[in-house]
């Protein structure tokens, strides 16, 4: 049985969205790393994956430490407004992931950008474009 890549991506996106919501409540409990630690972990992962220079790691870390909390703030606004429409949460996620990718493209080399896309970012971008086209 072959799974539809769109369905897989949608499931992963929903899980990520729910995880972000749970992450905010878990911050108070100390169960999971906070949003800044997650940004550092992602910067470290990309450094290993893409062989980033120190200055590039700094920019990745700075980008994520700005954009992750901003995305979480938008999630909180939706949650406080008692929005139940999952597509609105997905739109917020897509907006911030697109902004992060645009930032990365500015300071990654062409080889790093290609490797980043091959690591799964290209699939995510295509899925975002499909969702955007449906609107």
Regions picked out by a protein language model, each given a short descriptive name:
Residues 25-135:
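Charge-rich (acidic/polar
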Residues 1-31:
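Bacterial Sec-dependent N-terminal signal peptides
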């Amino acid at each position: 049985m072959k799974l539809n890549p769109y369905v897989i991506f949608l499931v992963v996106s929903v899980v990520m969205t729910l995880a972000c919501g749970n992450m905010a409540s878990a911050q108070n409990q100390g169960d999971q790393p906070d949003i800044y630690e997650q940004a550092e972990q992602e910067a470290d992962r990309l450094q290993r994956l893409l062989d980033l220079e120190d200055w590039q790691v700094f920019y990745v870390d700075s980008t994520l430490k700005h954009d992750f909390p901003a995305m979480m703030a938008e999630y909180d606004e939706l949650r406080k407004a008692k929005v139940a429409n999952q597509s609105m949460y997905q739109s917020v996620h897509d907006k911030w992931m697109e902004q992060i990718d645009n930032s990365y493209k500015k300071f990654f080399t062409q080889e790093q950008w290609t490797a980043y896309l091959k690591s799964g970012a290209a699939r995510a971008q295509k899925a975002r474009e499909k969702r955007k086209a449906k609107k």
